[in-house]
């Protein structure tokens, strides 16, 4: 496998820490050892997150093309767009963000706090669009890029989650290589890695990275899109493309992509009672904050799988914390009383 042939622009502090979740593990019976790899603490750029790791491989391409404007898309409370805005500010580039109405949640301050507030503070041109949630290339995003061209700018396209970008899976191939180095220091290997999946490139990169040592199917994706067939197809397609890029040496097959579809509801961006319980439990036992859109759902999935005995006794499970806490203030109605 050859990830090193791709240029990388450093935006993160370095390897993200692995934290034992001792109190949560004990609360769930102590038969499974839970750990978290803190991608939510990976950068000084506006709280970082998993997209910052991906953007390290997109930035060299943007600079090589002479782009002057990063153009990205997400929901109103998109973590992706906040991270793109931060990277643009860091590089001295312009930034245009399309923020679509992906979540059916009504709150008078929803489009004025959290991620979107931070993006505005960093100077991004934020454009609210009424289109609803879907996965894939969006017309509103293409129109935003054309508007930059018409104004004489040179846009660089960054799709939702970086996922439809040809280089979008590379960052989390690097995640797997980083975990292997940390495992050598820890003296053990993780039996499972749990990760939230929506647009797919985070899990896709992990699948490729862990395929290098035979653990592709030990990456357990927790769907948060509530459109699992689209998500599964996108993960598989991105993983196959990424495997070719890094010269993995074998094909990615359907069995490599494991996606648990039980925790994505009731719909994208809206939490179930189980998700809210998981968010509060993790916060109160570990002081670790997760959000109702992404990480709360993957935390719910991991907790439930432990309770149901779906991880063998003695298993060591690594939870990939991808970020998301900056969106919590947008859900203040749900968490008014904690």
From Swiss-Prot:
One Pfam family named in its UniProt record: PALP
CDD domains the record matches: ACCD
InterPro entries per record: ACCD_DCysDesulf (IPR027278), ACP_carboxylate_deaminase (IPR005965), ACP_carboxylate_deaminase_bac (IPR020601), TrpB-like_PALP (IPR001926), TrpB-like_PALP_sf (IPR036052)
EC number: 3.5.99.7
Molecular function terms from GO: 1-aminocyclopropane-1-carboxylate deaminase activity; D-cysteine desulfhydrase activity; pyridoxal phosphate binding
Family: Belongs to the ACC deaminase/D-cysteine desulfhydrase family.
Function per UniProt: Catalyzes a cyclopropane ring-opening reaction, the irreversible conversion of 1-aminocyclopropane-1-carboxylate (ACC) to ammonia and alpha-ketobutyrate. Allows growth on ACC as a nitrogen source.
NCBIfam families: ACC_deam
Quaternary state and interactors: Homotrimer.
Record-given protein name: 1-aminocyclopropane-1-carboxylate deaminase
Species assigned in the record: Burkholderia cenocepacia (strain HI2424)
Lineage, broadest ranks: Bacteria, Pseudomonadati, Pseudomonadota, Betaproteobacteria, Burkholderiales
């Amino acid at each position: 496998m050859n990830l090193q042939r791709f240029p990388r622009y450093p935006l993160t502090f370095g390897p993200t820490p692995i934290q034992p979740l001792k109190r949560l593990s004990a609360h769930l019976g102590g038969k499974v050892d839970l750990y978290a790899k803190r991608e939510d603490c990976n950068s000084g750029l506006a709280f970082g997150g998993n997209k910052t790791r991906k953007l390290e491989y997109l930035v060299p391409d943007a600079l090589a093309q002479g782009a002057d404007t990063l153009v990205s898309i997400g929901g109103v409370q998109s973590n992706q767009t906040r991270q793109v805005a931060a990277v643009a500010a860091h590089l001295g580039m312009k930034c245009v963000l399309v923020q679509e109405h992906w979540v059916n949640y009504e709150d008078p301050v929803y489009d004025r706090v959290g991620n979107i507030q931070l993006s505005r503070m960093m100077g991004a041109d934020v454009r609210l669009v009424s289109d609803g949630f879907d996965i894939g290339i969006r017309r509103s995003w293409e129109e935003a890029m054309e508007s930059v061209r018409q104004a004489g700018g040179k846009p660089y396209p960054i799709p939702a989650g970086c996922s439809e970008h040809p280089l979008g899976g590379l960052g989390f191939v690097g995640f797997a290589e980083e975990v292997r180095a940390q495992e050598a220091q820890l003296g053990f290997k993780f039996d499972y890695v749990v990760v939230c999946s929506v647009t797919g490139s985070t899990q896709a990169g992990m699948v490729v990275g862990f395929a290098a040592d035979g653990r592709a199917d030990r990456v357990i994706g927790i769907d948060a899109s509530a459109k699992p067939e689209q998500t599964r197809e996108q993960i598989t397609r991105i993983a196959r493309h990424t495997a070719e890029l890094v010269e993995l040496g074998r094909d990615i097959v359907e069995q490599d992509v494991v996606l648990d579809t039980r925790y994505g509801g009731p719909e994208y961006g809206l939490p179930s009672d189980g998700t809210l319980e998981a968010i509060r439990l993790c916060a109160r036992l570990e002081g670790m904050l997760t959000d109702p859109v992404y990480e709360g759902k993957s935390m719910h999935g991991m907790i439930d799988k432990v309770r149901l005995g779906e991880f063998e006794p003695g298993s060591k499970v690594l939870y990939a914390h991808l970020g998301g806490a900056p969106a919590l203030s947008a859900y203040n109605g749900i968490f008014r009383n904690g």
